[in-house]
């Protein structure tokens, strides 16, 4: 990968098998994670350990925030179940790592200004689930009101790329729990010169990931949805 390309991942959600497959495919170059390392899945410590060991730059997601603070007020009961389980098993060191993550990350690469946030730039932790097709005016406002050339968002678990005014707003999709009807692990790259976004999808051992979720006593839906991409 050349210096003009950056790799983005998001919403790993403690899915070790999906993360390992993605990182095996991505060779070289900086990797950025748009939040939610944990939640739903059965390997929070292993995921955090890998992210830390590889120096992947991350921002804080809403599940990360809930795990390290205990604030579950914005979650449904099944998600709360997974958050409380994760709080019990995550190491103190890894919890402190999550708490240290920035809510927004601003970068400059090859004369391109970049803004990374989990949900939305104005409300990175508790913002809405947004998509260019359902929220066109919001995306137009981001393109006109923010100075950044590139804006990366997570949270939705659905990949997209919105191009406007020589800018791009994108979501790489979810590594560990896609929700667009396709269960494959997702990530994307961006060419800093052309702003072209390339999306990638990879299969992984979903049987193993699902079995771990069930064996951990987590809600079964978090296992079954891995096969449906919902």
Where do the PLM segments sit?
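Anionic-ligand binding region
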Residues: 128-170
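Conserved hydrophobic/aromatic beta-strand scaffold that supports enzyme active sites
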Residues: 104-106, 116, 161, 187-189
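Acidic, His/Gly-rich catalytic cores of divalent-metal-dependent hydrolytic chemistry
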Residues: 162-230
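Beta-strand-turn-beta hairpins that frame and shape the catalytic cleft
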Residues: 1-7, 107-115, 164-168, 194-196
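Histidine-centered catalytic micro-motifs
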Residues: 12, 116-122, 151-159
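Active-site-proximal segments of metal-dependent phosphoesterases and phosphodiesterases across multiple
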Residues: 75-80, 114-146, 178
């Amino acid at each position: 990968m050349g210096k003009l390309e950056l790799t983005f991942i998001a919403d790993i959600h403690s899915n070790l098998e999906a993360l390992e497959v993605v990182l095996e495919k991505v060779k070289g170059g900086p990797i950025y994670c748009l939040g939610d390392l944990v939640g739903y899945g059965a390997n929070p410590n292993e995921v955090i350990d890998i992210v830390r060991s590889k120096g992947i730059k991350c921002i804080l997601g809403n599940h990360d925030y809930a795990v390290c603070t205990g604030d579950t007020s914005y979650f449904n009961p099944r998600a709360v179940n997974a958050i409380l389980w994760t709080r019990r098993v995550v190491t103190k060191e890894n919890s402190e790592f999550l708490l240290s993550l920035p809510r927004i990350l601003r970068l400059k690469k090859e004369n391109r200004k970049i803004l990374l946030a989990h949900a939305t730039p104005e409300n990175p932790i508790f913002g809405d689930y947004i998509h260019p097709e359902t929220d066109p005016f919001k995306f137009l406002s981001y393109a006109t009101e923010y100075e950044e050339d590139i804006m990366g968002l997570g949270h939705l678990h659905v990949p997209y790329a919105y191009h406007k005014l020589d800018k791009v707003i994108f979501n790489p999709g979810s590594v560990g729990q896609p929700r667009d009807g396709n269960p494959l692990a997702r990530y994307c790259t961006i060419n800093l010169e052309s702003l072209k976004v390339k999306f990638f999808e990879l299969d992984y051992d979903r049987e193993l990931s699902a079995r771990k979720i069930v064996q951990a006593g987590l809600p079964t839906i978090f296992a079954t949805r891995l096969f449906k991409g919902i």
